[in-house]
């Protein structure tokens, strides 16, 4: 089964770094609608940011 990750998040979405031990968090206030907006948001460490569950 192929899983497609949704990287376009709505305003208010809280994201956290996927890197073990990082834990930084970012809240999306205004989603990006630019070319390449389907790419994952990333932490400065380089790992993807994922929605907080």
Curated annotation (Swiss-Prot):
Induction: Up-regulated by copper, cadmium, cobalt, nickel and zinc, but not manganese. Copper and cadmium salts afford the strongest metal-dependent induction at about 1,000-fold. Also highly up-regulated under conditions that are believed to be attained in phagosomes of interferon-gamma-activated macrophages, including production of nitric oxide and reactive oxygen intermediates, mild acid (pH 5.5), and cell wall perturbation. Repressed by RicR. It comes from the Bacteria. Cu(+) 1 binds at residues 17, 22, 34. The keyword Metal-binding applies. Cu(+) 4 binds at residues 24, 32-33. The keyword Metal-binding applies. Belongs to the metallothionein superfamily. NO and reactive nitrogen intermediates (RNI) can displace Cu(+) from MymT. This is Metallothionein.
